[in-house]
Amino acid sequence: MGGRRAPEGSPAAGNDRLKAARVRIEDVAAQAGVSMKTVSRVLNHEPNVSERTRQRVEAVVEMLRYRPHPSARVLAGRRAYLIAMLFDNPSSNYLMEIEMGVLDACQAHHYNLMLAPLAYDDHDLVRKVESLVVQSQLDGVVLTAPITDDAALLARLAALGVPHSSVSAKEENRHAGVAVDEVGAVCAMMAHLTSLGHTRIAHITGHAAHGASGWRLTGYREGLRRAGLRFDASLVVEGEFSHESGHRAAKALLKLKQRPTAIFAANDDMAAGAICAICESGLSVPQDISVCGFDDTPIAHQIHPALTTVRQPTREMGRLAATELLKEIREPGSGGFVNVPYTLQLRRSTGPVGV
């Protein structure tokens, strides 16, 4: 009563036998008429494979429904096919976007991703990262701010030969990775505010340990200079890149004898916190005080009024950082540093003075 078996020696018969057992890389190589090394290169998106060969191998992989076993890949290539994203950042919106971008790159290149939360100010940070790399057999790590700028960690990773790339590292720490011209972006935002007639503009900084905090403060001061405005230290309040710190900083600014007419917060979470504080004080945004941020994370669209902000393509930045890391893993020295463009997103949280 069973179905008809394919004639012995026919391609269909061969496929029947392959389905009866797990398809191996040897089966793909034999069917495609290439070596196992060539199949491995195609699966790992490595160079030095002709487009015609690549297409033939990919067609056989699809036909046989071959899926490489993780342990076999490790043994064949002496890699774990695993990278980690190291982070210590209170902005969950920002981290989620970066993480999704890193995942995009990992999935495209058949790698797995480990998320590793760390404390930047932990005196044992370097040892913990070294232990993570060794115990998990990581192929490399993506560093996010402020971990990107830990000199001792960078030196140890280099000494161990651990490939790494960074998201928004300081100029002197840039190897493989990605960044935006943050100083130029903030200058553009300041030009937007001054064009609306604002002359008393406050700034809520990020955490002092983050390179981005320094760049954005520099952009704020340069923007004032270009507009012919004097820097006033009383209008600068330190935050920590969190909603709570933005709320707290805005409360302090509202207590000034002469309050600001506009607030530039160093990220969207703090800008959202500032808007909450202003509304709680019985004032309106932007009628009484304009507010703007940086990043264009989802919260910028979720609050009311919608937030004017600098858009840096955070998901794309995560993808690019991981892509450059994977290049570095495959061929040391091949990973590069990529600068991505920013754009101003002008929304309803900013307006002319007194309007």
Name each region found by the language model.
Residues 1-20, 78-191, 195:
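Alpha-helical recognition/docking segments in bacterial nutrient-uptake
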Residues 1-80, 354:
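N-terminal helix-turn-helix DNA-binding module of bacterial transcription factors
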